[in-house]
């Protein structure tokens, strides 16, 4: 939440909006994820209810309440922002895609999904899911984010792609070794037969050498006796 608040303030500083929009955006940033305390499903709507209740208790105007609610609902992932305010809160909410700590944040999300039995991704599956997210599902909307955050997002994407490529190369190498091992041990009876013949021949030669040695000894003994 603090990250979203800071990102919202950064975007506000570089955008042309009025005081009411600024106040509503900051409040929306603080309240946008509080609905998780009520559950994961449709948490944005739960966040709106909590924010509305708080603002009403503190005598906020209906105009401000409506604007805060509108901005909170704009953080819903499937929502396409319709104005500058929604663009700001949307970009702020996804600013972690452009942060140096993106990988750590992503891993925490994977663990959270596992903890709540929502989805269990392997490391490789999670990397691919993140690559898909950054290439197909996410985009920044404000001019400031496009100019200042998009490059960092692309660098994070590149790191993910490189990591996945290394994993695939390692798996392919291990798979190749396993295939060769299986080929020569199990899938090549001809080689096994050849090995058997070689061992048999070697044993036969050893036995012949032993027999020849014994024969030479007997001949020597007989020669001594005769003499």
Question: Each predicted region: which residue ranges?
Answer:
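Divalent metal-dependent phosphate-bond-processing catalytic cores, especially two-metal-ion Mg2+/Mn2+ enzymes
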Residues: 2, 6-19, 31, 60, ...
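An active-site-proximal "capping" alpha-helix that borders the catalytic cofactor pocket
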Residues: 4, 8, 43-58
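His-Asp-centered metal-binding catalytic motifs of divalent-metal-dependent phosphohydrolases/nucleases
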Residues: 21-39, 43, 47, 68-76
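Residue-level marker of motif borders
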Residues: 27-28, 88, 207
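Juxtamembrane loop-transmembrane helix junctions in multi-pass integral membrane proteins
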Residues: 84, 193, 200, 207-210
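Short, charged/polar, low-complexity loop and linker segments
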Residues: 182-202
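Alpha-helical transmembrane segments and their immediate juxtamembrane boundary regions
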Residues: 206-227
């Amino acid at each position: 939440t603090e990250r979203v608040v800071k990102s919202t303030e950064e975007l506000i500083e570089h955008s042309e909006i009025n005081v009411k929009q600024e106040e509503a955006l900051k409040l929306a940033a603080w309240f946008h994820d509080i609905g998780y305390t009520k559950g994961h499903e449709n948490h944005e709507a739960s966040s709106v209810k909590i924010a509305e209740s708080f603002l009403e208790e503190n005598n906020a105007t209906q105009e401000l309440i409506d604007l805060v609610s509108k901005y909170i609902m704009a953080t819903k992932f499937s929502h396409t922002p319709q104005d500058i305010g929604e663009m700001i809160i949307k970009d702020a909410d996804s600013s972690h895609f452009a942060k140096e700590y993106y990988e750590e944040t992503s891993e925490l999300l994977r663990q959270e999904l596992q903890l709540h039995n929502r989805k269990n991704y392997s490391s490789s599956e999670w990397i691919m899911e993140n690559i898909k997210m950054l290439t197909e599902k996410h985009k920044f909307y404000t001019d400031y984010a496009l100019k200042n955050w998009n490059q960092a997002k692309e660098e994070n994407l590149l790191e993910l792609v490189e990591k996945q490529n290394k994993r695939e190369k390692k798996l392919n190498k291990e798979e190749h070794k396993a295939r060769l091992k299986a080929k020569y041990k199990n899938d090549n009876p001809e080689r096994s037969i050849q090995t058997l013949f070689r061992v048999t021949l070697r044993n036969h030669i050893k036995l012949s050498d032993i027999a020849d040695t014994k024969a030479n000894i007997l001949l020597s003994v007989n020669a001594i006796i005769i003499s």
